[in-house]
């Protein structure tokens, strides 16, 4: 009788939060019990460790066989260019990842041989998802006699009513930038139907295009108009995004447009709910800003086919329905879209967010963080949104500045 071969591989992940780490430890324990020939040596790292330190470890021969890799040109793109990651297309076909996840999720982990982001071979799969949606305080809406808005005009009407009744309509914290740029991106992408998403995809993935989009111009105009009408929480310019979230949690405004990373924080306030971003008129399936966490990849350190095959088995488990249930039990949003997932009964807010996620991905509606477009776009967005809301910049000037940032980046890539 021939003994089964054993495989050992090391794994790097960034799940340092206690509940996240417990979920991963349980997943590894279950997986290795089901595959007794496989041993996984887990190591938890910071986000920054997945960048230059990971590359140095892989080039020196001391790196992990499986690692979470940050998407984008400076990280995954650089590792692909240096042939430090293995393509996963054969495994994606074997395990059904291409049917389990929509293109809008998998594209984020694709790189072509010409270093085109968003196309070509698949180099990773993510386990957690995230999106920016509409949080609302039902008690405050009920007090004002307002139904949950489904469209952008309904949201604007609701905010006008709330303002008239002395209830701050929309929480915003602009001090550290992110919440402002995410609101602008949300107002832009809610004007884009998923059936017409290709130009935005091309823009974000560096294929080409322009920010000179009338829908972005309209979004910037809406944002400035809301400010002038007093819909934002007073003093928002001096409030950070986490402080803004805490103010909303404490009932200081009726609405907050922000991400699912606040689900755990808001869980204790039963008046807080999560909904789809109200869509613009004439849009059937609007995009919602979002993405995934870092992708699980197989590195050049997996020297044998057996190691790579076993690593792929593990990655398949990490993105499986079973793992999705572990994430949900821990209070996090899985990237998978299992309609029969086991959602904790004591967490209705998480259930609302997960149902929104499932519906969104059913029509391929997961949009983009606009700052992905160029290495400098995050700074450009933050600065221009602050100037826009200080009435020191017109919507047209904002659009022109974003487009200039993009055009300069494309020139640096020598792409038309």
Identify the meaning behind each predicted range.
Residues 1-84, 94-95, 99-100, 148, ...:
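Conserved N-terminal structural module of periplasmic/extracytoplasmic solute-binding proteins
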Residues 33, 60, 120-121, 144, ...:
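Extracytoplasmic/periplasmic substrate-recognition and gating elements
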Residues 89-104, 191-218, 279-288, 342-345:
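Short, solvent-exposed loop/beta-turn-alpha elements that line the ligand-binding surface or hinge
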Residues 205, 333-337, 353-407:
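C-terminal capping/gating helix-and-loop segments adjacent to ligand/active sites or protein-protein/ligand interfaces
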Residues 44-53, 152-157, 235-249:
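Short helix-initiation/N-cap motifs at beta->coil->alpha
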Residues 159-161, 202-236:
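Glycine-centered hinge/linker elements that transmit conformational signals in sensory
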Residues 73-132, 182-183, 273-275:
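Hinge/lid segment of periplasmic solute-binding proteins
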Residues 114-127, 132, 156-208, 253:
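Extracytoplasmic/periplasmic solute-binding protein
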